[in-house]
Protein backbone atom coordinates (compact mmCIF):
# COMPACT_ATOMS: atom_id res chain seq x y z
CA UNK A 1 0.00 0.00 0.00
CA UNK A 2 2.87 2.34 0.84
CA UNK A 3 4.51 1.58 -2.51
CA UNK A 4 1.30 2.45 -4.39
CA UNK A 5 0.95 5.83 -2.66
CA UNK A 6 4.59 6.70 -3.31
CA UNK A 7 4.23 5.66 -6.96
CA UNK A 8 1.10 7.77 -7.39
CA UNK A 9 2.79 10.77 -5.76
CA UNK A 10 5.85 10.35 -7.98
CA UNK A 11 3.74 10.04 -11.14
CA UNK A 12 1.63 13.05 -10.13
CA UNK A 13 4.67 15.22 -9.50
CA UNK A 14 6.26 14.02 -12.74
CA UNK A 15 3.11 14.90 -14.67
CA UNK A 16 2.87 18.28 -12.95
CA UNK A 17 6.53 19.27 -13.24
CA UNK A 18 7.24 17.43 -16.47
CA UNK A 19 5.53 20.07 -18.60
CA UNK A 20 8.06 22.72 -17.56
CA UNK A 21 11.13 20.55 -17.98
CA UNK A 22 10.29 19.36 -21.50
CA UNK A 23 10.50 22.78 -23.13
CA UNK A 24 11.25 23.53 -26.78
CA UNK A 25 14.75 23.47 -28.16
CA UNK A 26 16.30 26.81 -27.14
CA UNK A 27 19.20 26.86 -29.64
CA UNK A 28 16.79 26.50 -32.56
CA UNK A 29 14.61 29.31 -31.17
CA UNK A 30 17.68 31.47 -30.73
CA UNK A 31 18.71 30.77 -34.31
CA UNK A 32 15.26 31.74 -35.61
CA UNK A 33 15.21 34.99 -33.65
CA UNK A 34 18.77 35.80 -34.66
CA UNK A 35 17.99 35.16 -38.33
CA UNK A 36 14.88 37.32 -38.22
CA UNK A 37 16.74 40.16 -36.50
CA UNK A 38 19.72 39.90 -38.85
CA UNK A 39 17.53 39.90 -41.95
CA UNK A 40 15.55 42.93 -40.85
CA UNK A 41 18.71 44.78 -39.87
CA UNK A 42 20.37 43.85 -43.15
CA UNK A 43 17.40 45.15 -45.11
CA UNK A 44 17.47 48.44 -43.23
CA UNK A 45 21.21 48.86 -43.70
CA UNK A 46 20.99 47.88 -47.35
CA UNK A 47 18.24 50.40 -47.97
CA UNK A 48 20.10 53.11 -46.06
CA UNK A 49 23.32 52.47 -47.98
CA UNK A 50 21.52 52.58 -51.33
CA UNK A 51 19.60 55.76 -50.52
CA UNK A 52 22.64 57.55 -49.05
CA UNK A 53 25.69 56.61 -51.13
CA UNK A 54 28.84 56.98 -49.06
CA UNK A 55 31.28 54.99 -51.16
CA UNK A 56 32.14 52.70 -48.24
CA UNK A 57 29.87 49.78 -49.08
CA UNK A 58 28.12 48.65 -52.20
CA UNK A 59 25.04 46.44 -52.45
CA UNK A 60 26.92 43.87 -54.49
CA UNK A 61 29.88 43.63 -52.09
CA UNK A 62 27.82 42.81 -48.99
CA UNK A 63 27.28 39.04 -48.89
CA UNK A 64 24.14 37.73 -47.22
CA UNK A 65 26.00 34.97 -45.37
CA UNK A 66 27.80 37.48 -43.12
CA UNK A 67 24.52 38.88 -41.85
CA UNK A 68 23.25 35.63 -40.39
CA UNK A 69 25.95 33.10 -39.44
CA UNK A 70 23.48 30.54 -38.04
CA UNK A 71 21.38 30.39 -41.20
CA UNK A 72 20.89 26.91 -42.61
CA UNK A 73 20.19 26.14 -46.26
CA UNK A 74 16.82 24.71 -45.31
CA UNK A 75 15.73 27.97 -43.61
CA UNK A 76 16.56 30.25 -46.54
CA UNK A 77 13.27 29.59 -48.31
CA UNK A 78 11.20 30.76 -45.32
CA UNK A 79 8.81 33.72 -45.23
CA UNK A 80 11.43 35.94 -43.58
CA UNK A 81 12.88 37.22 -46.85
CA UNK A 82 11.10 39.91 -48.82
CA UNK A 83 9.98 39.02 -52.33
CA UNK A 84 11.51 42.19 -53.75
CA UNK A 85 13.37 45.28 -52.62
CA UNK A 86 10.34 47.62 -52.64
CA UNK A 87 8.57 45.61 -49.92
CA UNK A 88 11.64 45.86 -47.71
CA UNK A 89 11.70 49.60 -48.30
CA UNK A 90 8.04 49.94 -47.34
CA UNK A 91 8.58 47.98 -44.14
CA UNK A 92 11.54 50.12 -43.16
CA UNK A 93 9.60 53.27 -43.91
CA UNK A 94 6.63 52.15 -41.81
CA UNK A 95 8.96 51.27 -38.97
CA UNK A 96 10.59 54.70 -39.04
CA UNK A 97 7.24 56.47 -39.22
CA UNK A 98 5.92 54.58 -36.23
CA UNK A 99 9.01 55.57 -34.24
CA UNK A 100 8.50 59.25 -35.08
CA UNK A 101 4.78 59.23 -34.32
CA UNK A 102 5.14 57.66 -30.86
CA UNK A 103 5.48 60.99 -29.03
CA UNK A 104 2.70 62.70 -31.00
CA UNK A 105 -0.28 61.64 -28.91
CA UNK A 106 -0.79 63.74 -25.80
CA UNK A 107 -4.08 62.26 -24.65
CA UNK A 108 -4.65 59.69 -21.99
CA UNK A 109 -5.52 56.15 -23.03
CA UNK A 110 -6.87 54.84 -19.74
CA UNK A 111 -10.54 54.15 -19.06
CA UNK A 112 -10.60 56.73 -16.26
CA UNK A 113 -9.59 59.48 -18.66
CA UNK A 114 -12.40 58.52 -21.01
CA UNK A 115 -14.81 58.64 -18.10
CA UNK A 116 -13.55 62.09 -17.08
CA UNK A 117 -13.89 63.41 -20.63
CA UNK A 118 -17.44 62.09 -20.82
CA UNK A 119 -18.34 63.64 -17.47
CA UNK A 120 -16.86 66.97 -18.60
CA UNK A 121 -18.89 66.90 -21.82
CA UNK A 122 -22.08 66.15 -19.90
CA UNK A 123 -21.32 69.02 -17.52
CA UNK A 124 -20.77 71.40 -20.44
CA UNK A 125 -23.97 70.33 -22.16
CA UNK A 126 -26.17 70.65 -19.06
CA UNK A 127 -24.76 73.90 -17.64
CA UNK A 128 -25.05 76.16 -20.69
CA UNK A 129 -28.17 77.88 -19.38
CA UNK A 130 -26.46 78.97 -16.14
CA UNK A 131 -24.81 82.37 -15.91
CA UNK A 132 -21.46 83.02 -14.27
CA UNK A 133 -22.67 86.01 -12.25
CA UNK A 134 -22.68 86.06 -8.47
CA UNK A 135 -26.05 86.35 -6.68
CA UNK A 136 -27.44 89.85 -6.13
CA UNK A 137 -27.06 89.77 -2.34
CA UNK A 138 -23.33 89.05 -2.72
CA UNK A 139 -22.77 91.97 -5.11
CA UNK A 140 -24.48 94.59 -2.94
CA UNK A 141 -22.30 96.90 -0.77
CA UNK A 142 -23.36 94.95 2.33
CA UNK A 143 -22.52 91.61 0.72
CA UNK A 144 -19.69 89.24 1.47
CA UNK A 145 -16.23 90.29 0.37
CA UNK A 146 -17.06 93.95 -0.14
CA UNK A 147 -13.95 95.12 1.74
CA UNK A 148 -11.78 93.42 -0.83
CA UNK A 149 -13.78 94.90 -3.70
CA UNK A 150 -13.45 98.51 -2.73
CA UNK A 151 -12.35 100.78 -5.52
CA UNK A 152 -8.81 102.09 -5.60
CA UNK A 153 -9.94 105.69 -5.12
CA UNK A 154 -11.79 104.81 -1.91
CA UNK A 155 -8.75 103.00 -0.54
CA UNK A 156 -6.41 105.89 -1.34
CA UNK A 157 -8.77 108.47 0.17
CA UNK A 158 -9.21 106.50 3.37
CA UNK A 159 -5.45 106.01 3.77
CA UNK A 160 -4.62 109.67 3.13
CA UNK A 161 -7.28 110.80 5.59
CA UNK A 162 -6.08 108.38 8.28
CA UNK A 163 -2.41 109.22 7.76
CA UNK A 164 -3.06 112.97 7.94
CA UNK A 165 -5.05 112.49 11.17
CA UNK A 166 -2.25 110.44 12.73
CA UNK A 167 0.41 113.02 11.84
CA UNK A 168 -1.55 115.91 13.35
CA UNK A 169 -2.54 114.19 16.62
CA UNK A 170 0.61 112.38 17.75
CA UNK A 171 4.14 111.69 16.73
CA UNK A 172 4.65 108.26 15.22
CA UNK A 173 5.52 105.65 17.84
CA UNK A 174 7.43 102.41 17.44
CA UNK A 175 4.26 100.47 16.56
CA UNK A 176 2.80 103.00 14.11
CA UNK A 177 4.29 101.47 10.98
CA UNK A 178 2.97 98.01 11.95
CA UNK A 179 -0.56 99.31 12.40
CA UNK A 180 -0.39 100.93 8.96
CA UNK A 181 0.54 97.62 7.37
CA UNK A 182 -2.51 95.84 8.77
CA UNK A 183 -5.02 98.48 7.64
CA UNK A 184 -6.96 97.98 4.48
From Swiss-Prot:
Region (Disordered): 130-149
InterPro entries according to UniProt: Adrenomedullin-reg_peptide, Calcitonin/adrenomedullin, Pro-ADM
UniProt keyword Aminoacyl-tRNA synthetase, yes or no: no
Residues recorded as bearing Arginine amide in the entry: 41
Annotated localization: Secreted
Recorded superkingdom: Eukaryota
Positions of post-translational Tyrosine amide modification: 144
Disulfide-linked positions: 108-113
Molecular function (Gene Ontology), one example: adrenomedullin receptor binding
Keywords, comma-separated and alphabetical: Amidation, Cleavage on pair of basic residues, Disulfide bond, Hormone, Secreted, Signal
Function: Numerous actions have been reported most related to the physiologic control of fluid and electrolyte homeostasis.
Family according to the record: Belongs to the adrenomedullin family.
Protein name: Pro-adrenomedullin
Amino acid sequence: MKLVSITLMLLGSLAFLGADTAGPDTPSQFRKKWNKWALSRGKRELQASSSYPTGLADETTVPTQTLDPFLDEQNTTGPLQASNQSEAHIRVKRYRQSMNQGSRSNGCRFGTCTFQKLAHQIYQLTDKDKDGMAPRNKISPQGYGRRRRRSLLEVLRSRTVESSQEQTHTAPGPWAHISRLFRI
